[in-house]
């Protein structure tokens, strides 16, 4: 078993009060408990959820002070005495779901994210915007040794989340899926997972740069909501028979796209809600929902099996992660870009900088 020298202090980005900003400072390195591992985080993806955690604008209380982040890829450097499924030296990832009880009805039916005792990385427990992070061994993502940690990091939330959403939609090879918010970090991977699963991807977002990116990633069509005169008609026209997509994956972080989806989804189609606009409501006309037999579902991250499946697509080279890497010290600048809607693809922070 390899031995690692573990420092007493480390660099981290800490939210010291609700609303932020983050403070780049040194904090102690924690020791893992009996069922936990300590991961030397090399890279961490930056997710819109991290911004919500800093701002505290979700109806779920955050830990304070808080180290955010839940897409941490690194190396296991220590483990508790009860841990047998993970070894020191393994490549592993910290996900949104840091731990669960493994004993409730949800955990026993592979719905661990719904566990009433779930621990959430970078929200209810400290996450991956630090050089050394703790996670329950049963829930760490096992990253194949051949995978590049820098590009693996965003798969640990964005990849798993959109892959699970596509599974929940029930779409089959040859069918069409509309991806709303396709130019962002989740959307860029959703397009690729859709292609890998044999689906026709219709990308919906705003701006020429995002359109170019979506087409390069394999979207069969791109609908620009900033220039279209009739979004509903354009989305339907992008499907082979003009009847609309079989499923809609809503990754948007504003409310309006959720209302629009009912108008263009195919009859007997499924709308999957993933994006979490603060304070938003989903309003759908009851008449249309009933007579067109529309299904509306929420999809929330993924379980342990979903995690390994999503990573397998990546390990086989079917998913490319378009990233921009900056030092951990620049995290607040990434949040500022996120607030302004200027992010294309996914930002990753390097914890060594």
From Swiss-Prot:
The protein's enzyme class: oxidoreductase
Sites where the protein binds NAD(+): 181-187, 205, 210, 274-276, 346
Catalytic activity: a primary alcohol + NAD(+) = an aldehyde + NADH + H(+); a secondary alcohol + NAD(+) = a ketone + NADH + H(+)
Residues the record lists as binding Zn(2+) 2: 101, 104, 107, 115
Localization (cell): Cytoplasm
GO molecular function: alcohol dehydrogenase (NAD+) activity; zinc ion binding
Residues at which Zn(2+) 1 binds: 47, 70, 157
GO CC field: cytoplasm
Classification via InterPro entries: ADH-like_C, ADH-like_N, ADH_Zn_CS, GroES-like_sf, NAD(P)-bd_dom_sf, PKS_ER
Main location: cytoplasm
TM helices/strands, residue ranges: none
PROSITE patterns documented for this protein: ADH_ZINC
Cofactor(s) needed by this chain: Zn(2+)
Keyword NAD attached: yes
Subunit-structure text: Homotetramer.
PANTHER family: ALCOHOL DEHYDROGENASE 1-RELATED
Family: Belongs to the zinc-containing alcohol dehydrogenase family.
Name under which the protein is recorded: Alcohol dehydrogenase 1
Annotated gene: adh-1
């Amino acid at each position: 078993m390899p031995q690692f020298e573990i420092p007493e202090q480390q660099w981290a980005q800490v939210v010291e009060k609700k609303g932020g900003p983050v403070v780049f400072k040194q904090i102690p390195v924690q020791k893992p408990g009996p069922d936990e591992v300590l991961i030397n985080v090399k890279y961490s993806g930056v997710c819109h959820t991290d911004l919500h955690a800093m701002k505290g604008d979700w109806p779920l209380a955050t830990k304070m002070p808080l180290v955010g982040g839940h897409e941490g890829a690194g190396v296991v450097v220590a483990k508790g005495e009860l841990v047998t499924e993970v070894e020191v030296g393994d490549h592993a990832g910290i996900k949104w779901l840091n731990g669960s009880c493994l004993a409730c009805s949800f955990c026993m039916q592979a719905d661990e994210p719904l566990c009433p005792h779930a621990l959430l990385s970078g929200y209810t427990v400290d996450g991956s915007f630090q050089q050394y992070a703790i996670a329950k061994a049963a829930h760490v993502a096992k990253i194949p040794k051949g995978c590049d940690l820098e590009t693996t990091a965003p798969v640990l939330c964005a990849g798993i989340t959109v892959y699970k959403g596509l599974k929940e939609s029930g779409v089959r090879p040859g069918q069409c899926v509309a991806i709303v918010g396709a130019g962002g970090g989740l959307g860029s991977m959703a397009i690729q997972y859709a292609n890998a699963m044999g689906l026709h991807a219709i990308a919906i977002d705003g701006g020429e740069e995002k359109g170019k990116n979506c087409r390069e990633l394999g979207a069969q069509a791109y609908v620009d909501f900033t220039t279209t005169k009739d979004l509903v008609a354009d989305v339907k026209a992008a499907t082979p028979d003009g009847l609309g997509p079989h499923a809609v994956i809503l990754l948007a972080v504003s409310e309006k796209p959720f209302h629009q989806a009912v108008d263009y989804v195919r009859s007997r189609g499924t709308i999957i809600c993933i994006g979490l606009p603060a304070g938003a409501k989903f309003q759908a006309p009851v008449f249309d929902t009933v007579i067109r037999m529309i299904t509306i579902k929420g999809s929330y991250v993924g379980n342990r099996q979903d995690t390994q499946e999503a990573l397998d697509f990546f390990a086989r080279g079917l998913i490319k992660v378009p990233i921009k890497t900056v030092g951990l010290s620049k995290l607040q600048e990434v949040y500022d870009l996120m607030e302004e809607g200027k992010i294309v693809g996914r930002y990753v922070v390097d914890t060594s900088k």
